[in-house]
């Protein structure tokens, strides 16, 4: 297993839990602190018995999809708890379990991987050779050893955020704001011609807040400089000044890469396997749910005596079965639509989306709906949406016909 981030530790834990012999290769100390924050809908961790790993949990969870101003600032109340992982606790949880499970750590950088009919050999930059029946690359969004298709520009979700203390609360105390698309701090020309962005924010307690200006997705991605400027203007319009910046977060990751080639010998997991939800950007919940599925597929294939290409093929099938491949294609097609929407149309879309029954919008965001359930939710959304959104959904532009054809072909 290559990597030491959340994806790597999640799959290594599931493999060790099935009694498999696992070795891991990482270029740095696997206990080194993780840089990014990881938010998750609390129901996801509750279902997995991991709620104790949350640093914060909010019940007052809202979004804003009005234009802003006195008449356009009513919150949409989600009625679902949201959580923020304690990164250190999550990392420690996995590392302690891996220590008990017998994981063997190797320090170094993978330079090459050689395959024969039975096994693979990972060679490090320092000359070490590590032999394994199967190699799993969980090194992140830019893997060296996992081949992915190329069907056009990959959109990036970009965000600029600050953890800090402010002259007055930037959001209501005790609240989590999922999406605040109000744009009354921008000019009419900016709202019509520049990329839409939203505020993602949370009260961390003790007078500390996290505020982050986010672009859902765009190719090329929105520059950090514009996001920082947008955040400053949003706060200034509310009369809020930053008194102390405790942490600055820059976040950029690919939203809609093509799926990896399932015929290859190296199996990906996490960002390396295009597991980011193409329409929401969520990843960690998917890691927690899908690591056991991949581990089960690998363990069953090994027990059946499969090796080489047959083993890796079984692993890829376990990670990306037909239903998930189809949903991935559906979400990519949907994201392509949303990236063409201007600020007003995007607000109208999300206002309609969050008027769906909670089980439908939650299942969409967490990728837990079956394909028939997903289609039913989207039919209902179309019926709820205003005509500007309906026209935007019906008109096919750019590479949308090709993405639609891929979806109809099964992903």
Predicted stretch roles:
Residues 3-6:
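Glycine-rich Rossmann-fold phosphate-binding loop(s) that bind the pyrophosphate
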Residues 10-68:
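N-terminal FAD cofactor-binding segment of flavoenzymes
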Residues 14, 97-242, 258, 262, ...:
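Predominantly flavin-linked oxidoreductase catalytic cores and closely associated redox partners
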Residues 42-109, 113-118:
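A conserved beta-strand/loop capping segment in the N-terminal third of enzymes
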Residues 219-249, 267, 289-319:
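Flavin-binding catalytic cores
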Residues 250-269, 278, 325-329, 338-344:
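FAD-binding beta-loop-beta segment adjacent to the flavin cofactor pocket
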Residues 275-294:
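A conserved FAD-binding loop/helix module that cradles the flavin
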Residues 295-411:
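C-terminal helical "tail/cap" subdomain of flavin- and related membrane-associated enzymes
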């Amino acid at each position: 297993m290559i990597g030491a981030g959340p994806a790597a530790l999640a799959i290594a834990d599931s493999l060790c839990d099935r009694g498999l012999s696992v070795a891991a290769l990482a270029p740095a100390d696997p206990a080194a602190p993780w840089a990014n924050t990881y938010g998750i809908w609390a129901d996801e961790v509750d279902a997995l018995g991991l709620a104790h790993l949350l640093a914060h949990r909010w019940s007052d969870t809202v979004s804003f999809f009005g234009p802003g101003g006195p008449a356009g600032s009513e919150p949409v109340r989600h009625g679902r708890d949201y959580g923020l992982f304690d990164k250190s606790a999550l990392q420690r949880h996995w590392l302690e379990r891996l220590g008990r499970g017998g994981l063997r750590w190797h320090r170094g950088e993978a330079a090459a991987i050689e395959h024969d009919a039975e096994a693979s050999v990972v060679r490090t930059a320092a000359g070490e050779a590590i032999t394994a029946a199967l190699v799993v690359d969980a090194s992140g969004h830019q893997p060296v050893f996992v081949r992915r298709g190329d069907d056009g520009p990959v959109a990036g979700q970009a965000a600029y955020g600050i953890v800090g203390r402010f002259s007055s609360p930037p959001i209501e105390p005790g609240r989590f704001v999922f999406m605040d698309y109000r744009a009354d701090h921008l000019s009419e020309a900016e709202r019509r011609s520049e990329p839409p962005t939203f505020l993602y924010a949370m009260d961390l307690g003790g007078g500390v807040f996290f505020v982050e200006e986010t672009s859902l997705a765009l190719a090329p991605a929105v520059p950090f400089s514009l996001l920082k400027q947008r955040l400053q203007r949003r706060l200034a319009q509310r009369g809020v000044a930053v008194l102390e910046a405790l942490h600055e977060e820059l976040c950029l990751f690919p939203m809609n890469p093509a799926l990896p080639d399932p015929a290859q010998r190296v199996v990906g997991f996490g960002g390396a396997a295009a597991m980011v939800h193409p329409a929401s950007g969520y990843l960690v919940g998917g890691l927690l749910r899908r690591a056991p599925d991949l581990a089960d597929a690998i363990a069953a294939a090994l027990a059946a005596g499969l090796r080489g290409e047959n083993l890796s093929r079984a692993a890829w099938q376990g990670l990306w079965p037909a239903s998930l491949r189809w949903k991935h294609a559906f979400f990519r097609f949907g994201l392509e639509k949303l990236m063409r929407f201007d600020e007003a149309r995007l607000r109208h879309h999300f206002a309609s989306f969050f008027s769906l029954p909670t089980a439908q919008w939650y299942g969409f965001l967490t990728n837990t709906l079956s394909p028939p359930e997903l289609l039913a939710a989207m039919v209902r959304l179309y019926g709820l949406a205003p005509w500007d959104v309906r026209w935007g959904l019906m008109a096919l532009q750019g590479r949308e016909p090709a993405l639609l054809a891929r979806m109809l072909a099964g992903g």
